[in-house]
UniProtKB/Swiss-Prot annotation:
Coiled coil: none annotated. NCBIfam families: accD (TIGR00515). The lineage of its organism: Eukaryota, Viridiplantae, Streptophyta, Embryophyta, Tracheophyta. Keywords: ATP-binding, Chloroplast, Fatty acid biosynthesis, Fatty acid metabolism, Lipid biosynthesis, Lipid metabolism, Metal-binding, Nucleotide-binding, Plastid, Transferase, Zinc, Zinc-finger. This is Acetyl-coenzyme A carboxylase carboxyl transferase subunit beta, chloroplastic. One of its GO terms (biological process) is fatty acid biosynthetic process. The gene is accD. GO terms for cellular component: acetyl-CoA carboxylase complex; chloroplast stroma. It comes from the Eukaryota. It comes from Adiantum capillus-veneris.
Amino acid sequence: MVMSVINWFEDRQKFGGLIGAFLEEATRSSMTNERDRRISVNANKGLWARCDNCGNMLYVKFLKQNRSVCEECGYHLSMSSMERIELLIDPNTWIPLDEDMSARDILSFSDEDSYETRILLSQEKTGLTDAVQTGIGYLNGTLIALGVMDFHFMGGSMGSVVGEKITRLIEYATQRLLPLVLICASGGARMQEGTLSLMQMAKISSVLQLYQVQNKLLYISVLTYPTTGGVTASFGMLGDIIIAEPKAYIAFAGKRVIEQTLRQKIPDGFQAAESLFDNGLLDLIVPRNLLKGVLSEISGLYLSVPYNKN
């Protein structure tokens, strides 16, 4: 029986040696500009992806089956917001909220491209209206409110739409006494919106105060690569339970900014999830394929306790 090249690879999820060397050599020139940035896994862009940690060539079909985790080194590659929703929410139970909300360029901001152009390009690239998806759905049979940031939309930056959608999600969860899960992936506040983007930090923190303290409801924050800037400085670190993916980059300011400001060298891994966990800033580091089960157990434990608003 004649076997196609694709079928041959599908029978062998691990490939290396001469094949891996050949593939690396054949794609080296085209990958030069990609070496220093994370690879977004998208089947429409080809059959192969490259792990940003170990450099191994990965067959996209198997990579997606493995939740975008490198099977060679265990590195967690980036995921779209829709992929994360499909990972956590039971099939056919997802109900999006405020999905038609889109940003406006009220400051007429422009650098290389206008803000309006950047929004349109990101919308075309991702199919999203902005850098977060919010909604409700069942997680192993438990109804939760879920917000998922998408780094592929303008670096997951937080502007007025992101802040408003998350705020409305928290208010919705408060009214219906739902557990809240926010998946963070962001480069920080969106500079194109100026002060409007910065005020989202205070706005979200305020509604979380009502949700957590006054109503005693459960908020779980999940930090992924990368979670930085205004998201880290606000709702990212306000969870009752704070979870991170392995080796996630979590910071307020970048390493170079810190070193230039303090005029001293900071150690490697200083802003990795494992370092934050060792210093008591995180509660758990959970591999991606175990996250749904962990969230389900925490939510189930919380819901098993009789609700007492006082």
